[in-house]
Design a protein with these regions (language model features):
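N-terminal auxiliary segments of SAM/dcSAM-dependent transferases
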Residues: 1-48
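Conserved SAM-binding strand-loop segment of SAM-dependent methyltransferases
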Residues: 133-147
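Conserved class I S-adenosyl-L-methionine
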Residues: 89-96
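Conserved SAM-binding loop
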Residues: 127-128
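A short acidic, Gly/Pro-enriched loop at the edge of an enzyme's catalytic core
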Residues: 147-157
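Substrate-binding/catalytic lobe of Class I Rossmann-like enzymes that use SAM or dcSAM, i.e.
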Residues: 192, 198-294, 301-303
Length: 303
């Protein structure tokens, strides 16, 4: 099976003064894919040494008991399984499955079957290789969630720091509701502003972070998310707040891995992108020193 290759468009940048720019930019599905893939179509060989571990999880992991990248990744995924009450034979959907690590781990460890959605052909290819390597029943689709069709249903649908990219979040929750079997579970782990004041205008640091992801970030307050969950046929049963020290340690590990593998990474993506990504991780680390954001896993059930 041949690994796909695709040309990367130039990195999108804000124009004008940063404080005048707003979040929740609206793009066509085609442009949205191009913008996010400016990041996610970078070589996996760039991301994997940075993220580390067996499962290459590109989001905050849990460090209360863990001493290695793999242990921290598995601790977070085990928490997801506990919150979703996963049982053997169930069917789950990962929206924004990246290179397939979390979905493959959950299927392998908990005896479930899974479907993963990604917009990146390279991520799809690697996720499929990983699923085959671990001999799990996983289907990976290069598909926008809006276009995804399914007639079997799922016991659980989850996202891990993915809904920040969904401008039309209410429509996403309605879609999930239609995909879940009766009594099914939706889990969304995401970063939330502690006040609606913070999502009105962007600081230069915010703007830089959004440039990395093609200007597709749309952070909300937890209250805003819960309102949309309620309006689209769910009842929220668990709000699990994650200690921000876990994100600080995750970012520290990623930065340490970047420095350790600098020569290899620069050879892959060039010095400019290496420096920009390192600056991005430093800003992520700085974000979690403040009080403007929380990190929460929201577990809701279809009613």
């Amino acid at each position: 099976m041949t690994r796909p290759t695709s040309p990367l468009p130039s990195s999108p940048r804000w124009t004008g003064a940063a404080p005048e720019q707003e979040m929740f930019q609206t793009y066509s599905k085609e442009e949205y894919a191009v913008r996010t893939n400016r990041h996610y179509e970078q070589p996996p060989e760039f991301f994997f040494p940075i993220l580390g571990g067996e499962w290459n999880v590109y989001s905050c992991n849990l460090w209360e008991q863990a001493t290695t990248d793999t242990e921290s990744q598995e601790a977070k995924l085990d928490l997801f399984a506990k919150l979703m009450h996963l049982q053997p034979g169930q069917r789950i959907l990962d929206v924004g499955c990246a290179w397939g690590g979390p979905l493959v781990y959950l299927c392998k460890t908990y005896g479930v079957t899974g479907v993963g959605l990604t917009l990146s052909p390279t991520q799809k290819w690697y996720a499929e290789q990983r699923a085959a390597q671990h001999q799990v029943d996983v289907q990976i689709l290069e598909c926008n969630w809006e276009d995804f069709q399914d007639n079997q249903g799922f016991e659980a649908v989850y996202t891990d720091e993915a809904i920040v990219h969904f401008t039309n979040l209410g429509e996403f929750f309605a879609k999930v509701h239609s995909l879940l079997r009766p009594g099914g579970c939706m889990l969304n782990k995401e970063c939330h502003f502690t006040s609606s004041r913070y999502n009105q205008h962007l600081t230069r640091a915010n703007v830089f972070n959004h440039e990395i992801f093609g200007l597709t970030g749309s952070y909300r307050t937890l209250a805003d998310e819960l309102m949309l969950v309620d309006q689209n046929g769910f009842e929220t049963r668990i709000i699990h707040q994650i200690d921000l020290e876990n994100y600080r340690r995750t970012a520290d590990r990623w930065l340490s891995n970047m420095y350790q593998h600098r020569e290899q990474l620069v050879a892959l993506v060039g010095d400019d992108y290496y420096r920009r990504f390192r600056t991005y991780l430093k800003l992520v680390r700085k974000t979690w020193n403040g009080t403007k954001m929380t990190l929460d896993a929201v577990v809701s059930y279809k009613v």
